[in-house]
Each structure stands twice: as structure tokens, then as C-alpha cells.
Amino acid sequence: MTTRQLPLFGARRTQRACFFDLRGGKDSAKFSAYTPKAVKFFSEKYSLAVVTKPEDLAAFDVVFFSLHCFRDFYRVARMAHHKRPGQQWIAGGNACTTPTAVAWIMDYIWIGDCRASFPLLIAGERDLQGLYDPRNERLIRYVDEDIDPEPLTASEMEVSKGCPRRCLFCIHPWRHHYQEAPQEKVEAFIRAQPGKGVGLMSNSSDDISYYDDIADVLTATGKTDMTVSNAVQGLTEQIVSQRKRELFLGVEGMSERLRWVVNKPIPRAVYRDKLDLCLSHGKQIRTVYQFNLPGEEMHDFDELEDDVRCFQKKYSKGSWAIPFIPNQPSAHTPFQWVVPRYSVEMSERLMEFRKSLFGSNKTGVAFYSPAALGPAKWFAQVISEWIAITPTVADAVERLPQKQDVQTMVDALDCMGVALPRAFLHRDKDTVFPWSNIITTGDDADKWKRFAGMQKKLASERFQSGAPVVEDREELRKRAGGTAAA
């Protein structure tokens, strides 16, 4: 009788992999910031299923998650019980530079850009520099890949990444070095689009060295950049007159002195000149501001409100949206040493301001200010960088008082058995953060030096007196093409 030797090792079983869409397929609008672009890009390129119902995950061996924002940490907590034994969960995305929130449930967490490495993850590679294993506390260097001109979607491509401006609160300059996609690739992408809208993604369109040429191509082809954002000082007559959709402006600080202290030095005179330019053309504008910035007082808002009332009287057409975002000290930026605070008094004043704009379209410029994020929801985002967001923690967060200051909410969590680290409210140069094992550099690695510089500004006579930031104006005038007011 003939006998056969059985193989010592059988063929490796193919692992079934999928993406899980935490938003249940609800966010799919073109050009929306909430559309899960990474899920769409990777699932289509590598033929991966996208699952929208957690009960359907049992059929898969590897589940990929794209965590877009801090709210996604809570979404994971609510569906974590669907993870079956032996199943691997792997998270990546913008929120994962602070992995503590999901390290309790994820087997691996990707830190940084993943275009080049994603096929390796699908193939089963797990010993990769950007892959954080919560069971191993080794240092992980944020993966900052070279910009890739391959379109993200059929109508969107990344034109630049990083930011040369280095605002102290913003994640972009501190995680990525500044890069631009090849101009010829961008122009070819625009010309190839069948529709009228294209998404040319960047932190600020004005920083792109060849954007004037791109604007001419858009005009010649009858197309519009649907995702444009402008630096206030970069607005010119040409840009404003050519813009068919809303002009998006990140002003950030309510007053000149606040903008100066966070390294976004837009003088009030320049700011008003640019708003004047936009409204004289009857354009739609959206100016984004932060509140709860270091050193902020009520008279900072007085300055902003005076500017709004001035233009309210001056113009009879156009629209102006004025959203306010509570500052959240972000990890891996100079602001990581800023102790978080939420001024309930300021939020109440913003609400009164919002109400005062109702019906403005009946007499002139249509002003609109959406309701700002309240203290409890803001606090939920802030603490998610610091502690594991388990179902128990998520339940406690839902029971937080709605209109209280930070200390009161910290105490409320403590009473529910959820303790925050002491460093949450007490930070210095030697603080070890939950994310200290993640190394980011961008174009400037010395974040503490930048924070210390801000502290000096806050203590300066200029900041205390609110004196104009005179020495910054010449540079701003150059950036604006010589149109800034002296």
C-alpha cells in the first residue's frame, strides 16, 4: 500500500478583511469634511468590503477602522462588544496620534500616513514602524509620507500637506513637513474632471506656490474649487472676484492681540480691509474663530463685535457666517501644555450675539452664527486624548453636567469612578503625556520653545495693553500683494 507524507504546514488560510464605517454609511456627501474619505479610498483600491452594521463583523478576521475625530472614540466604545475572539481590530486615521482612547480594544493602531503601508497591513505585516501595538510600549515615529498626487476620490486630490505658518494651536505644521503636489498633476486632474466642482485639498490655498495658475485653469475650464480655504492676508481682488462659492477664512483669535499671541498675527486693519473687499463684492464669507484661547477676556470679543456691527451698517448684500469653536489644546502641538478651560460666561455671550443676528438678512448682509459646542461635549473630546474611552467611561461622560467649568466636570467624573491623570490640570516642561511615546516633528520639532515664547507674549506689556502688532504688518503686506493697510 502506497503511503503519503502529510505536509507539516498547511496552506495559510486567507484572512477576510473589511472596513467598518462608524457612521453607518450616513455621511457620503461630495466634498464634505465628514465623509470617510480614507474608507472610500482604501476599500475601493484594495477591494475591501465596507460594513455598516456591527452585527455583520463576525464574518471577518481583520477589521479596519478610520478614526476621523475624537467622537469616533465614543462610537468605538458603543460597538466594542461586537468584537469576536480571535478577530483583529486595526485603527488608523487623524485621531490616532493619541491612541490611548482605543488602545484597550484595538490590536494595532497606525500612526500617521498610510498610503504606502496599507497593502502591507492587508498582507498581514505587523512589524512596521508606524504600527503601534498597545502590548508593546516602544517609541513610534509618526509616518509623514511624501505627498501622493493620486486622487483621493473621483473629484478630490491632496494638493498640499503641512503648513508653513506654524500657528501654535494647529496640528498641521507640527506633524507634517510642508509639501505641494506637482503643479502639472493638479492641472491635469482639473482638466480631466467632467463635473463643475473639484476638491483641491490643502490647509490653506494661499500657501500653494502655484495657486494663482490653478485659479486661472479653474476659470478657463469653468470649474470651482469646492474645498478652498484662504488666509485672510492672502486675499486679493483677483481671488475674491473669481470666487463663485463661499470664502472660508480661519481668523481664529477674536482680537488682534489674541491672534498675535497664538502666532497668527493678523492686524485688525488688515482683517477689516479684507472683509471690506469680500463684502464689497457681495460674497459669501465664513470666518472661523476660537474662544477659550490663552489670555482671552471679554474685551477681546468686544473688538470682534464692533467689527461685525460696522459692516452690518455699511453693506446691504452678501452673507457672513461666524462660527465659534472652543479651543481644544491638541497633542503634538505647542498647545499641549495649555491647561484646558471652558468659559461658560463667554459661551453665554456668544449665544446672545447669535440671537442678535436673527433676521439680519431682512435689512442687509445675512449674518449667521451657529451654536457653539457646549462644555460637556467639548470636555468629552478633550479627555479622550488622556484616558481609555471604554463603555463605562462613555456612560459616565453622558451623565456630566451640561454647563459647568472644567474643574467641576473633572470632579463629577471622579465621583463616578473615572479619574483623570494629575497632569491633565498640572502641566510643565517635564510632563509625560499619554501620547509621549508617539514622536512627531513636522517642520519644527521644538514645541516647548514655541510654548515658552507664547508665555512671554502673554506676560508682555504689549499683550496687556492690547497695542497693535506693528512689526508684523510689513510681512503681511508682502503676503497680501501690497494691499494691506499700513
Question: Which sequence ranges carry the predicted segments?
Answer:
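N-terminal [4Fe-4S]-dependent radical SAM core
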Residues: M1-A17, D27, F31, E125-V159, ...
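Radical SAM enzyme core and accessory elements
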Residues: M1-L22, E44-V50, G359-A486
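Short, charged N-terminal beta->alpha structural module
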Residues: C18-A49, F73-M79
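Conserved SAM/AdoMet-binding glycine-rich loop
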Residues: F19, K26, V62, I190-E303, ...
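Canonical Radical SAM [4Fe-4S] cluster-binding loop centered on the CxxxCxxC motif
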Residues: G25-A33, D148-E184
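Flexible glycine/acidic-rich beta-alpha junction loops that bind and position SAM and/or redox cofactors
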Residues: K26, P99-V102, R165, W260-V262, ...
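A short, well-structured beta->alpha microelement
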Residues: S43-A59, E187
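Glycine-rich beta-alpha loop elements in corrinoid/cobalamin-binding modules
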Residues: T52-R138, P334-Q381, A396-P401, K447
